[in-house]
Amino acid sequence: MDYQEILDGIGVPLLLSPVPLEGGGYYLPDAFEYGEEGALIADGTLCGEGLELVVLHECGHKITGCTLSKLSAPQLHIVNEAKANRFMISRKAEDYLVEIDYMANYFTPERFLQRFKLSVELFYDMAEQEMKKIAKKNKHLLVY
């Protein structure tokens, strides 16, 4: 499933900024002038996989919902960023498994993170967790 299908499914329009955006993009839940679900704005100077990673991350803010416990604004921001990153990694790991023709030996966090130019330091644990879930879900398709 590509990011446009996800956006269509959640009813959030994608707006591309003509200038670079710090952080690559933002989900604006209160941008009601674009629809009931708000809007997603992404850095229009990005292309290809860079844009896809930003859009998937921002979709994660909408899809994973909000935290019910009382947190300070900085704590809540950290939680929301982690949820959005997990969503992005999960979707790209599913794509990666298809890309490597379900070859189990190549479905490693190191290769995945290198392929998408993501920080091993920041994303290794999360990628490992998500990839284990995906491998388990697709175990009947894996080639050893």
For the regions a language model picked out, list residue spans one by one:
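Active-site hotspot residues in diverse enzymes, especially metal/ion-binding acidic/histidine motifs
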Residues: 1-144
